[in-house]
Amino acid sequence: MNTWRNLPGKLKVSLLSLHPRLRREALRCGEDLNAAERELFLTLNRYDLAHSLAMARRLGDDPLLKRAALLHDVGKLRHELNIFTRWLCTFLEIFLPGRLRQLCATVEEKARGEGILERIRSLPRGWRRGFFVQAHHGEIAGALLRRAGSAEELVRLVEEHQHEPRDEKARRLRQADDAL
């Protein structure tokens, strides 16, 4: 993702996140999800809620894509990815992308375990764990959605939303995510 190109979308979502009825809209849109998915969706912070809702509006013509839009960022674990770490990632992506790649590679080497959730827990709390969560939030979301009993096609779309799209639905999801 090119953060400079995406800046207008980020500003729009930042403004949407301030809307006093954001939570009410999230509750209404969350009715399309199963109970476990809804619980995951409602744990998103205000910015991620606004981002997911804006994506869902863009993709609302397809029920599967709408659900994927609502759930694609549930892997951005609120207690692991704080605002400081998010801003640090964005700053490094814009101004020092080589340093960001280097830091991510170092964190990647230190993560141990079988599954993605075990690998997160193997890292010390703080920016390292936050960087790992930011880099792997699609896979994390996929693991959480599997536990929630989500349909495999939904899990695949969410899990792979940071990767090169392999079909039309994945392309549309990625395009909406990159625009906002």
Residue ranges and their predicted role:
Residues 42-180:
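Divalent metal-dependent catalytic cores for phosphoryl transfer on phosphate-bearing substrates
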Residues 1-40, 160-165, 178-180:
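Non-catalytic interface/linker regions that flank or bridge core catalytic/transmembrane domains
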